[in-house]
Amino acid sequence: MSDARKGPDEADDSQCDSGIESLRSLRSLPEPTAAPGSGSSQSGCPQPWRHAPETHKEPEKEDADGERADSTYASSSLTESFPLLERPEAKDPSPPAPGSPLPPAGVLSPQQLEALTYISEDGDTLLHLAVIHEAPSVLFCCLAFLPQEVLDIQNNLYQTALHLAVHLDQPDVVRALVLKGASRILQDQHGDTALHVACRRQNLACACCLLEEQPEPGRQLSHPLDLQLKNWQGLACLHIATLQRNQPLIELLLQNGADIDVQEGTSGKTALHLAVETQERSLVQFLLQAGARVDARMLNGCTPLHLAAGRGLNSISSTLCEAGADSLLLNVEDETPQDLAEDLLSYLPFDDLKISGKPLLCTD
């Protein structure tokens, strides 16, 4: 678990390569001279090694999860700030056709190159900003001109443009980034991949793009998508979807190879344990029908039936017993589910028991 708990400051250099070197290699032109005290070049475009003037700084915005989903970049319209990037074909917000060749770097003017290699004080590249400000013309211009490595640059919160596109519910942008080879396994400051974010926000459309789209021919796939990858809380995507009680999202993950019995990293709970804790019987039934192991054990030896019995969840206990749960398994404290149960009759998978001709009534 030591690896799963690493914070962003402790992450391996190989994992946290921001791609800055790619920007430096792209920007091989001599630096234009600016007037003393000026924050921009003579062309009027911001220089990539300077931050936006403080006088124009906008307050940061946060999304529903408390994550920063905006930038301190000066203008609310990137197309006004970077007019040199406007192209006739960039007016069309649809992504470039798959397999289209990348334009040679020589077609860029020095001013356009400065704009494309801009980095804000928050570590946001122009690609981050295009996602934040919903500027599709700038976004697809970046996708056409920038090398693949630049797509994976992480800002100061370790977010890639792909993270932000999911945060801001932009499935078309997510699809375009995946087609261009953006990494889907990079983790932000919480250890979340873009798919973790999609599961937490219950964004089925973005999750579909991340799971089902593949890079176009000629694009390098550096690392395959790992559905068992855990964030710093020890949660895989399936755990998050289960806690959100989102059955369509759970089904999508399972169809694409998620391990239904993967254990979270703190106490060893599986999705079935978490479903019991949500106290939603239909979710427990769904996971059992999908093949969840009914007697999966936590690190302390508890099965889902231990949890249901200890919480007095009689209907869920009955469902687990009907699926074959063993009510006599011991945990590390030598307790069985029967020891924890308030009502042993809840374990019996029958509803027509009679004593001396009188029915036994079991209530939840």
UniProtKB/Swiss-Prot annotation:
GO biological process: D-serine transmembrane transport
Intervals holding ANK repeats: 122-155, 157-186, 190-219, 233-262, 267-296, 300-329
Biased composition (Basic and acidic residues): 51-70
Biased composition, class Pro residues, residue ranges: 93-104
Recorded GO CC terms: cytosol; fibrillar center; nucleoplasm; perinuclear region of cytoplasm
Post-translational modification: Serine phosphorylated; followed by proteasome-dependent degradation.
Phenotype upon loss of function: Leads to marginal zone B (MZB) and B1 cell expansion, and a higher sensitivity to T-cell-dependent and -independent stimulation. Aged mutant mice are predisposed to an oligoclonal indolent B-cell lymphoproliferative disorder, resembling monoclonal B-cell lymphocytosis (MBL).
Assigned protein family: Belongs to the NF-kappa-B inhibitor family.
Protein name, per record: NF-kappa-B inhibitor epsilon
Species this protein is from: Mus musculus
